[in-house]
């Protein structure tokens, strides 16, 4: 079973409180979502492998450390997931970006895929799927399945706020995927939103509501 980790770093929790507030405007909301994503990346990548490399400083030659292993591809679930991309890229600027486009059918609450584009070498990379909300788990499951169908085997999921139902849904369908969240909230409401949550992340990021 993949692990589920809540990242309780004080800065993450402080910033999460700001974006939960209903009076927080789109500009501030968008900026802080990126900041939280960057802080989460620091925690998620804590165990990345390192290798020795010989370099030359202004003082002479030395052996130091650099990242080893698979390179990273960030895979945001459109559209809200785009709000987390820059925060991750600030930590790992060499990462590539793929996208999975989905929308939620407001009647069935089920996700519908409408776009998929990833780097050609994605099967040789670790994929970090990002989306601010893990509600029913439908979108995350569909995105992970789309990657697996293309041959990706190393996948992690990073979300800001998760509902218990969404965590269970992903763990049931993709037990090999580790999930990271800034918060595990109380429950999923009948309308498919998370409580207490932070509202519609996409609308708040892009100022469309």
Swiss-Prot record:
PANTHER family: ADENINE PHOSPHORIBOSYLTRANSFERASE (PTHR32315), URACIL PHOSPHORIBOSYLTRANSFERASE, CHLOROPLASTIC (PTHR32315:SF4). 5-phospho-alpha-D-ribose 1-diphosphate binds at residues 79, 104, 131-139, 200. It comes from Lactobacillus delbrueckii subsp. bulgaricus (strain ATCC 11842 / DSM 20081 / BCRC 10696 / JCM 1002 / NBRC 13953 / NCIMB 11778 / NCTC 12712 / WDCM 00102 / Lb 14). The keyword GTP-binding applies. Pathway: Pyrimidine metabolism; UMP biosynthesis via salvage pathway; UMP from uracil: step 1/1. Its EC number is 2.4.2.9. Belongs to the UPRTase family. Its cofactor is Mg(2+). The lineage of its organism: Bacteria, Bacillati, Bacillota, Bacilli, Lactobacillales. This is Uracil phosphoribosyltransferase. It catalyses: UMP + diphosphate = 5-phospho-alpha-D-ribose 1-diphosphate + uracil. Keywords: Allosteric enzyme, Glycosyltransferase, GTP-binding, Magnesium, Nucleotide-binding, Transferase.
């Amino acid at each position: 079973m993949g692990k589920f980790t809540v990242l309780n770093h004080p800065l993450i929790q402080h910033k999460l409180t700001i974006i939960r507030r209903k009076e927080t405007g789109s500009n501030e909301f968008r900026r802080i979502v990126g900041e939280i994503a960057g802080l989460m990346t620091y925690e998620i990548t804590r165990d990345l492998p390192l290798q020795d490399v010989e370099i030359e400083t202004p003082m002479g030659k030395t052996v130091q450390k650099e990242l080893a292993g698979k390179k990273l591809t960030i895979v945001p679930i459109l559209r809200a997931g785009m709000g987390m991309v820059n925060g991750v890229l600030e930590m790992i600027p060499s990462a590539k970006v793929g996208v999975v486009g989905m929308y939620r059918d407001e009647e069935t609450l089920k996700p519908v895929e409408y776009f998929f584009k990833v780097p050609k070498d994605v099967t040789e990379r670790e994929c970090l799927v990002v989306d601010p909300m893990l509600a029913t788990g439908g979108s995350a499951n569909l995105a992970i399945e789309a990657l697996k169908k293309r041959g990706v085997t190393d996948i992690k999921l990073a979300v800001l706020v998760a509902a218990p139902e969404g965590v269970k849904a992903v763990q049931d369908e993709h037990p090999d995927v580790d999930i990271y969240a800034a918060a595990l909230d109380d429950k999923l409401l009948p309308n498919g939103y998370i409580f207490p949550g932070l509202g519609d992340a996409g609308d708040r990021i892009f100022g469309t509501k």
